[in-house]
Amino acid sequence: MNKKFFFFDIDGTLAVGTPGRQYIPESTKKAIHLLKEQGHFVAIATGRSYAMAVDHMRSLGFENMVSDGGNGITIDNELITIKPLDYQKCLNLIDECKEKGFIWAISPDNKTRRLAPDSRFYDFTHDVYMDTEVVEGLDPRNYDQIFKVYVACFAPEEQKLETLKELPWCRFHKEYLFVEPGDKSVGIKMMVDHFKGDYKD
């Protein structure tokens, strides 16, 4: 039997239900266990940050994960790396948000909460995906790196943000969008390379 590499997304693949109230069916856990028993390589591949995905990884019995939209790698339960977004492009976007009155927040670290300069982000979104912590006078330049930026607006308002075109982004909720890496294949290839696998598998 040829060893195969299986990568599973969390949202909408392993986890069912609405964000913030998701669960993983027992049948899914059993199927993953059977793949491992048969000698196949299994890993999570998610757009979620490491901090927002690691509990799912552990509860499902995974040891390996591609996180942060392809920019994070965990091997044998050890976080190897998370590459942040382009710092200057994030600052440019936040500056434009301030200038044009867009509500914004950031994830400057690997934690299960985002930072916002005031309560407007939560007031606008009522988001349950992750906690929003208010840091009065939040200045993104006080942080060395930025992993995600969040912009609260309804589509197609984001088209007014010229600097958004320079960054990868997606919309999972009608109230706000995520500026985050979106090419999980980058992390998947890094993982297959690490284990000296073949991409065809």
Model-inferred region functions:
Residues 1, 11-14, 48-56, 174:
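N-terminal-biased segments
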Residues 2-21, 44:
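Asp-based phosphoryl-transfer active-site loop
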Residues 5-7, 64, 197, 201:
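Hydrophobic "anchor" residues on beta-strands that sit immediately upstream
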Residues 22-27, 149:
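Substrate-gripping "pore-loop 1 plus following alpha2 helix"
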Residues 27-120:
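Active-site phosphate-binding/coordination module
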